[in-house]
Amino acid sequence: MYKRQYTQDESYYLLDADEDEETYVYLGLKEGVDKKEMERELRAAEKGEERFPVEKYVNKIPVKKHDHVLIPAGTVHCSGKNTMVLEISATPYIFTFKLWDWGRLGMDGLPRPIHLDHGMKNIQWNRDTKWVYDNIVGQTRTMEKTENCEVERTGLHSREFIDTIRYTLSGPHTVSMDDTVHVMNLVEGRSARIESMDGSFAAFTVHYAETAIVPAAVGTYRIVPEEGEMIRMLVASVR
């Protein structure tokens, strides 16, 4: 629409989820959705005439801590309550077209502005319940597993250009970068140390839920769990 070479491919990584409550994300359309009826109800909700019946049209997908839900551009989505989500996005500041704002009002007492015209044009209507479960839910694959290390590819979808690898470690592990920048987030454990293999940068510590960047020029680096605990580090890169 805006003549860009890329779109807002993203994903939700569940940093945490309430174990005593229902936890979910909204993802993809239900089977047999009537496009015209959905648009009619969205426009009525935009005017504040009625509340949009989300669960009539959008799948409510159960999730738990450490699930990774993939969201290729054009997929209807929203995070759910009782969850803490790490959003990994190719374009975190553009291309978000809101279809409904959950009835929230602006300072003028009217529903806040949304992007319904653009949003309706960008929905991929074939991404229904079956497509969601076949392609973007539960896609984690183990790449390597030893006594002190498990390496898993958790995403992203084949249509997307960002790859995500999760390292579950109880000891030091060396990571090769394949000439691409690494953006990492500690998703389990209190802290981990990132060390240079050749002294090209000073070692630094990443704490829980913090994000750090290792430039592509580094080549290889080492992740070291601190305080003798098991950690999980999620690393995103451009593939």
Regions found by a protein language model. Name each.
Residues M1-K65, G80-R190, I194-D198, A203-F204, ...:
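Active-site region of the double-stranded beta-helix
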Residues H68-C78, I94, T211-A212, A216-I223:
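Histidine-centered metal-chelating micro-motifs
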Residues F204-R239:
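TerminUS-proximal long segments
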